[in-house]
């Protein structure tokens, strides 16, 4: 693997976020990355492209998504009323999650480049589903690589992809999860990039993918900022999003980064505990290295090999993280915290029980952190407004949660009303 020489001077857009990012890929892929970057720059400068994309976001995806204030949480107690939790409802985007925002943008880019085939990787199946429906809409061939373990635990999404006409290829190598699906997708793209576009599903990978994904997801924070100002007359105190690779979080953070008074928090999967060896908290507990074409934080062992990540949530089960998140952490602009499986399961049940919303397990990590902060604010009598990215709906997780709670009855929510 080689990095493109003189990278800072030979790309149209900045390829690094501080020391993180770059293009650590086989030289044979550099022309494809150059073509993608040029197409992206041309498209974003085109009023016609922006109008077409805006039309899809409005009429097909259902944007803008609403902002919902939790009416029953945090639970009643002394000091009730100090903390307010608002949910940015990306679970209501067509396809069931935030993923469709940037997928529509990238598929339009692919058509603009004359590509006829789309390659994607998926973990929980949400990105694969979004890619499959976008390809069905726009008449492109779709191939989705998915870890064999994820295929087994996300059967409803596998069938949804197939209904949209996608070919789903289970990946047996390695741990059979998202990391291995990315590897296979990159191999495919290396061999077929003249007719194929690799539609990366997270804000990681080689430049220009982190920038492209952020810009197509930025609509989340642009809408949320305007909605918070309209509803509360001020910006939120805290913005929280779950972080695996980091796409929904960078979309949720993007328009708040320059607002120094807004605290940005990424909720990483602490799995069975940060000291258990079974987690995916890349920034909280990882090291700097190179994975999937970018320099960022990753999970690796004492020999320098990439470690297998773990999370109850397939969409957070990734041993790397987007380079802009690494930079936000390194500069202190954002804070990244670990949320355990047990905490996420409690939050999943709380939101379903008390607000009538079934969140994705991924989003439940962010909501779990919001509940913690709200509890502290209530106890201390501190006025606090928390904005949570509810990145996806939990239909895909219901069976998994049911089985897990049957096996671990101590995690079943006790009714506190």
Swiss-Prot record:
Recorded GO CC terms: cytoplasm
Pathway info: Amino-acid biosynthesis; L-tryptophan biosynthesis; L-tryptophan from chorismate: step 5/5
Keyword Lyase: yes
Reaction catalyzed: (1S,2R)-1-C-(indol-3-yl)glycerol 3-phosphate + L-serine = D-glyceraldehyde 3-phosphate + L-tryptophan + H2O
Entry's EC annotation: 4.2.1.20
Chloroplast listed as a keyword: no
Molecular function as annotated in GO: tryptophan synthase activity
Cofactor: pyridoxal 5'-phosphate
Physiological role: The beta subunit is responsible for the synthesis of L-tryptophan from indole and L-serine.
Family classification: Belongs to the TrpB family.
Self-association and partners: Tetramer of two alpha and two beta chains.
Identification of the protein by name: Tryptophan synthase beta chain
Species whose genome carries this gene: Corynebacterium glutamicum (strain R)
Organism taxonomic ancestry: Bacteria, Bacillati, Actinomycetota, Actinomycetes, Mycobacteriales
């Amino acid at each position: 693997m080689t990095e493109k020489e003189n990278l800072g001077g030979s790309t149209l857009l900045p390829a690094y976020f501080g020391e993180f990012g770059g293009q650590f890929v086989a030289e044979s892929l550099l022309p494809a990355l150059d073509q993608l970057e040029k197409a992206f720059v041309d498209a974003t400068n085109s009023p016609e492209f922006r109008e077409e994309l805006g039309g899809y976001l409005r009429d097909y995806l259902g944007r803008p998504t609403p902002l919902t204030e939790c009416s029953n949480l945090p639970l009643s107690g002394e000091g009730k009323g100090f903390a307010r939790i608002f949910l940015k409802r990306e679970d209501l985007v067509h396809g069931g999650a935030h993923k469709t925002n940037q997928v529509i943008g990238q598929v339009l880019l692919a058509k603009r480049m004359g590509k006829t085939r789309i390659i994607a990787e998926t973990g929980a199946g949400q990105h694969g589903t979004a890619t499959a429906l976008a390809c069905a809409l726009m008449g492109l061939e779709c191939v989705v690589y998915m870890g064999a373990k994820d295929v087994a635990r996300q059967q409803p999404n596998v069938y949804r992809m197939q209904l949209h006409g996608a070919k789903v290829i289970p990946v047996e190598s390695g741990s059979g999860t998202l990391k291995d699906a990315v590897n296979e997708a990159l191999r495919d793209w290396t061999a077929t990039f003249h007719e194929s576009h690799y539609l990366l599903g997270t804000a990681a990978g080689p430049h220009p993918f982190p920038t492209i994904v952020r810009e197509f997801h930025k609509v989340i924070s642009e809408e949320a900022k305007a909605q918070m100002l309209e509803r509360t007359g001020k910006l939120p105190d805290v913005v929280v999003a779950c972080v695996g690779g980091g796409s929904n979080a960078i979309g949720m953070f993007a328009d708040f980064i320059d607002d120094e008074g807004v605290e940005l928090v990424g909720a990483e999967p602490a799995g069975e505990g940060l000291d258990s060896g079974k987690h995916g908290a890349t920034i909280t507990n990882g090291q700097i290295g190179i994975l999937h074409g970018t320099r960022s934080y990753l999970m690796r062992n004492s020999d320098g090999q990439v470690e297998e990540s773990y999370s109850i949530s397939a969409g957070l089960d990734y041993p790397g993280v987007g380079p802009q998140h690494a930079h936000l952490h390194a500069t202190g602009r954002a804070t990244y915290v670990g949320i355990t499986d047990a905490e996420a399961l409690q939050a999943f049940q709380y939101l379903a029980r008390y607000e009538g919303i079934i969140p994705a397990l991924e989003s439940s990590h962010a909501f779990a952190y919001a509940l913690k902060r709200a509890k502290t604010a209530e106890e201390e009598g501190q006025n606090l407004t928390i904005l949570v990215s509810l990145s996806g709906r939990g239909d895909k997780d219901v069976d998994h949660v049911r089985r897990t709670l049957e096996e671990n009855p101590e995690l079943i929510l006790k009714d506190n009303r």
